[in-house]
Regions:
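Conserved glycine-rich cofactor-binding loop
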Residues: 8, 15-16
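Substrate-binding pocket helix/loop in short-chain dehydrogenase/reductase
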Residues: 95-97, 101-109, 189, 196, ...
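Residue(s) in the substrate-gating loop at a strand-loop-helix junction
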Residues: 138
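Alpha-helical segment proximal to the catalytic Tyr-Lys
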Residues: 125, 167-171, 228
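C-terminal helical subdomain
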Residues: 178, 201-226, 230, 237-239
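Active-site helix of classical SDR
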Residues: 120, 154, 162
Length: 244
């Protein structure tokens, strides 16, 4: 039997990269997956690429009204959620302290922190007992990387959320964990010069960038019963970058 046979999963921000890879794997492993994205054209393309048992819902995680539409769609379609993977997020790799504005701060925190909280809160009534909530973090929160203070702070907030929510939801058997990718070969990295990509890879103990499939496999572990005794952790998938 597949690892997610008959389960219902929601993955936000799943039109590309790591979350798209996770959605594809979850469907392969037997789940019906609801994916979200802000742009309908990208969402439609992702649904077509995944194929099979998937539903696309246009939703901006930074907009509470859009989150209500997501809840309505899941309630009407299946009435429950077994796995919630909060992957939607935004940020920039180059925003030093002197460049941060009120608008840029509010925008990043609005999606990455407020959006994550209200995504979980609004879908919580549909969460099955024994379900899994996965928050998409990042290894940058503990590294002190210049130009990423705001983005890193949002990921540190998710780490705090996971610990608190794991304690709050333990009575329902709901597990809450953070999945923190390191440098991964997605569109953001693909747009950098080759020499920079090589420098980044050289910093990683395993001497390569992560692939979306690497992240998807760990998301599957956290989503499935394989991690039934795991909650409140921050699981780094970074080739050892933040560990060694």
């Amino acid at each position: 039997m597949t690892k997610l046979h008959g389960q219902v999963a929601v993955i936000t921000g799943a039109t590309a990269g790591m979350a798209l890879a996770a959605a594809t794997l979850f469907v392969t492993e037997g789940a019906h997956v609801y994916i979200t994205g802000r742009r309908k054209d990208q969402l439609d393309d992702a649904v077509s690429e995944i194929g099979g048992s998937v539903t696309g819902v246009r939703s901006d995680s930074g907009n509470p009204r859009d989150l209500d539409l997501l809840v309505d769609a899941v309630r009407a379609g299946h009435g429950r959620v077994d796995v919630l993977y909060v992957s939607a997020g935004i940020g920039t790799v180059e925003e030093p302290l002197t460049a941060v504005t009120e608008d840029s701060f509010d925008t990043v925190f609005g999606v990455n922190v407020r959006g994550a909280l209200f995504t979980v809160q609004k879908l919580l009534p549909l969460m099955s007992s024994g379900g899994s909530i996965i928050l998409n973090g990042s290894t940058v929160w503990g590294k002190g990387i210049p130009g990423q203070s705001v983005y890193a702070a949002t990921k540190a907030a998710l780490r705090s959320f996971a610990r608190t929510w794991a304690a709050e939801l333990a009575e329902r058997g709901i597990r809450v964990n953070v999945l923190s990718p390191g440098p991964t070969d997605t569109a953001m990295i693909a747009g950098t010069p080759p020499e920079l990509r090589e420098k980044i890879a050289a910093l990683i103990p395993l001497k390569r960038l992560g692939q979306p499939a690497d992240i998807a496999k760990v998301a599957l572990f956290l989503a499935s019963d394989d991690s039934s005794f795991v909650t409140g952790i921050d699981l780094s998938v970074d080739g050892g970058l933040a560990q060694i």
